[in-house]
Design a protein with these regions (language model features):
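An edge-strand/N-cap motif at the start of beta-rich repeat modules
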Residues: 29-59
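Short loop/turn segments immediately following the C-termini of beta-strands
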Residues: 44-46, 94-96, 143, 153, ...
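Beta-rich, blade/repeat-based domains predominating
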Residues: 48-49, 74-85, 122-133, 137, ...
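Short loop/turn segments immediately following beta-strands, especially the blade-tip
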Residues: 57-63, 104-111, 151-160, 210-219, ...
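A short beta-strand motif characteristic of beta-propeller blades
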Residues: 66-72, 114-119, 172-177, 222-226, ...
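Blade-loop segments of beta-propeller domains
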Residues: 66-135
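Blade-level signature of beta-propeller repeat domains, shared across WD40, Kelch, NHL, RCC1
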Residues: 361-366, 373-398
Length: 398
């Protein structure tokens, strides 16, 4: 299948006046118990029995989870992320036009969360949030409205007035049901904090913005240059109908792996000497001959940079790929069933020893041991019961 590159038709960028607010410093991390982590689970609360954000302990020496409990009651926290300082946790609360981003203080021993404040997400249905590399800003992707926003983190952990707001506009993909409009689904800062990357499911594109870490502002993608025709070095386009959902970078930043939800495929982009991302491979996350319904969901590169994992909702599996260190291309290794239905998300523990799969419709988190030599996954028999799990974030336990 031919991979094309199209220039973004329109991009509306709104830069908000900068408020004179104190930004959060980069405090030292608290001393952690060796191999002991807190695992925070984001959930959907609407039409489920979930109360909000859950937490359980996880011991990487044994692979044993501890008893799970409610860390904070909050509506539909579909994405959670722990600040690099370990002092704060932020959650995206999906609520249509009333969507918010919540800030919590973290108790590093018990895992309990204390609400610091909530602010509007400046869009509808935020589904992803992350931090810039300085830890001074929260980056938010609002799915239904196709907008992204940047918020400064104040010294007490609360979020200040936005420093940037952008709405994606332009030609949408061919899937009339899912690509009727722009849908920002993932946002991350690059390794050097100079660019912010946004996967837009509706546009079949990863948008790339210049990021100013001093002001928290974003600037539009640069126009075409004679050195790299016809590729815009600050955008990357997938096949029509791919529906980019999430992406992951190689540890050295040379390769970007974009998961297409609608076509259940990973597109590999290589970063060349001119700073442009060029598509070099597309590979399916499904076994040959599979004809059932499937929506690819999550993607992650193992900490050792040798393997890539992607989840399939429908086939109910994790696809495992080996990464070629020279050219970044993928070779299929295996499919492993997740032990439940609708694996919307999974997370690899920071030590790289375990993968935890969140099965949304079977209300469980299933633990797998990772073979760090082959990338293989083996279920340990450990299962954590939690209502409608859709995201998981690890943090070292004090």
């Amino acid at each position: 299948m031919k991979i094309t590159t199209r220039l973004l038709a329109f991009l509306v960028l709104v830069l908000a006046p900068l408020a004179l607010l104190s930004s959060a410093p980069a405090p030292k991390r608290a001393a952690a118990k060796k191999g002991q982590y807190l695992a925070y689970v984001g959930t959907y609360t609407t039409k489920t029995s979930s109360k909000g954000i859950y937490v359980f302990g996880f011991d990487t020496a044994t692979g044993q989870p501890s008893a799970i409990e409610v860390a904070a009651a909050t509506p539909d926290p579909s994405w959670v992320a722990v600040h690099p300082s370990g002092k704060f946790l932020y959650a995206a609360n999906e609520a249509g036009k009333a969507s918010t981003v919540s800030a919590f203080a973290v108790d590093g021993k018990s895992g309990k969360l204390t609400l610091l404040g909530q602010i509007p997400s400046l869009g509808e249905d935020p589904c992803y949030l992350s931090f810039d590399k300085t830890g001074k800003y929260v980056l938010v992707a609002n799915y239904s409205s196709g907008t992204i926003a940047v918020f400064p983190i104040l010294a007490d952990g609360r979020l200040g007035e936005h420093t940037a707001l952008a709405k994606d506009q332009g030609p949408t993909g061919p899937n009339k049901e899912r690509q009727e409009a722009p849908h920002a689904h993932w946002i991350e800062a690059g390794a050097h904090n100079q660019f912010v990357y946004v996967a837009d499911l509706g546009l079949d594109r990863v948008l790339i913005f210049k990021f100013d870490a001093t002001s928290g502002s974003l600037t539009p993608a640069a126009p075409l240059t004679a050195k790299a025709p016809p590729l815009n070095p600050l955008s990357a386009t997938l096949n029509p109908g791919a529906g980019p959902r999430h992406a992951a970078f190689a540890p050295d930043g040379k390769f970007m792996y974009v998961l297409g939800e609608l076509q259940s495929a990973v597109t590999v982009f290589a970063n060349d000497a001119e700073g442009a991302y060029r598509a070099v491979q597309q590979i399916s996350t499904l076994p040959k001959g599979f004809a059932g319904r499937n929506d690819a969901a999550e993607i992650a590169v193992h900490p050792n940079g040798k393997f890539l994992y992607a989840s399939n909702r429908g086939h109910e599996s994790i696809a495992i790929f080996a990464i070629d260190a020279k050219n970044g291309t993928l070779t299929f290794v295996a499919h492993v069933l997740t032990g439940g239905k609708e694996p919307r998300n999974f997370a690899i523990d920071p030590s790289g020893q375990y993968l935890l799969a969140e099965n949304q419709l079977s209300n469980n988190v299933v633990v797998f041991k990772i073979d760090r030599a082959t990338g293989g996954l083996t279920p340990t028999g450990q299962v954590v019961e939690v209502p409608s799990p859709v995201d998981l974030a690890f943090w070292p336990r004090e």
